[in-house]
Amino acid sequence: MARLTSILVFLIAFGISIPSQSSPEVAKEPLQSSVKIPSASQWDMRSVLNGHTYRIFVSTPSSSPPPGGFPVIYVLDGNAAFPVAALLARNTESRSAVTGIVPPVVVGIGYPNDEDYDVSARKRDYTISEKKADSSADEGAADEFLDVLEKEIKPAITSAYPINANRQAIFGHSFGGLLVLHALFTRTKSFTTYLASSPSIWWKERILLNELPAFKLAMSDQPAPYIQLSVGSLEDQVRPPSLAGGTQTSVNKRAMVTETHNLASVLQTFPALKNRFHYYELVDEDHGSSWLPAMSRGFRLFLSNQ
């Protein structure tokens, strides 16, 4: 007993801890922090024009801007699409010395929540209507949104970052692709490159196509922008087949591949768009995945035409 007491005194004196057999050590959870995107920032902006709030994401190159400023690409559904676009921009910058391509500023336009897609807000902002929508509309407010983009978001970006106003692109998918085409047909000078991924041409009995004649006429007396139109080859198929039935009927009515292909066939006949219009049917991509290769190809088209 005396020996055990001496050992305990020795251990305590030298600060040596004694493991407890009855209370095994429990591993602590590692400290956690939010994931950050390099060279990126965000803020919320309440529009004076329509009263809605938008979350603006911006990624900037780390290099010095060229004399004319950086090209800029505006990306719709920013909550989901901005991280991918920002990565593509960083990859472009990392290879700039080899390719000679100037990296872009990326501006994601999203909504102040943690969802990838704000279903109700994007339906409101990205869909078109034959008549002007009011501030309480839940759809068909594309023109009001484009006014916000043109008169509020763009000036805010231009005042804060060295932007080349002669090199501006817009990318959108699904309803976002519909908005991109509507902007192309009705506001042809707003951007120099329009990237429409899997556009919802079916919306409201294809009223988008009513804008084609005026667009063709406008193209006869002004420089044509660069255009990319794309769709996934599997977008008209329901997988797995067990989900067919009502779901397949809905997909058939939208006819994403057929409608996009038909529009491409029309645009390819416009003389002003020769060498400026690019159409892709993306093999083995469905509606949920097609925007990823579409964005990658769109970056290439936009940035390679300096």
At which residue positions do the language-model features occur?
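Non-catalytic cap/lid and distal C-terminal segments of serine-dependent acyl enzymes
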Residues: 23-306
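N-terminal signal peptide c-region/cleavage motif recognized by signal peptidases
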Residues: 15-19
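Bacterial N-terminal signal peptides that target proteins for export
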Residues: 1-8
